Amino acid sequence: MRDCCHQKSISSIIVALLSLPMSNFVAHGQQGTPAEPIDVETKMEFALRGQREAHAIKYGDWRKFCFQTPGAKTVCRTTISGKWETGQSAVRVDFIEREGEDAARLQLFLPVGLYLQAAARLTVDQGKPFRIPFVWCLTNTCIAGDRANPALIRQMETGQQLKLEVADTNLLSVSTMLPLSQFASVRKAAASRIFKQEVDE
């Protein structure tokens, strides 16, 4: 019984987070403004000391999950996760959409130990990078998120690879490449799983 209640509690938290309006997720100072492409050379407020690739990360397939709560609009998450060879979670990218709304949100779950002022940067193939600011950190993960720029969405749907760049605390640029070949088809398809949250009377 205790395990059952614990699982319901976790499910409630997940649904509650995904049910918040998109504007509630936007970082302070960026409300209502989607991530814009940046010129890294001119907009960087600090000097990176070098670069390195992230340790080997194995990515799974893109998947789509939807969350339904009575009296609220359905929220769907098209997501991909990557793990290190140890099996520990390394990266998760969520593309979040709410039924009936044009705005979408990109949310990145990343390891701790990063230089948060640098923000995360997403680049599709050889395009310009889009800046995704960090929103908050927990004990074992840091979360970056912002409204998804329509141009970035179009690039993700037609591109082949998504480059994710962050800066570590040594001011080294760290990057990893995520596959995009399945993104568009998974996003437009039916959800592979639907979570229904009942409201207690």
Stretches with model-predicted labels:
Residues 1-14:
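Bacterial N-terminal signal peptides that target proteins for export
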Residues 1, 22, 34-37:
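Intrinsically disordered, low-complexity regulatory regions of eukaryotic regulatory proteins
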Residues 28-201:
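A generic "folded-domain core" signal
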Residues 2-3, 18, 129, 133:
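Well-ordered, non-transmembrane segments within structured domains
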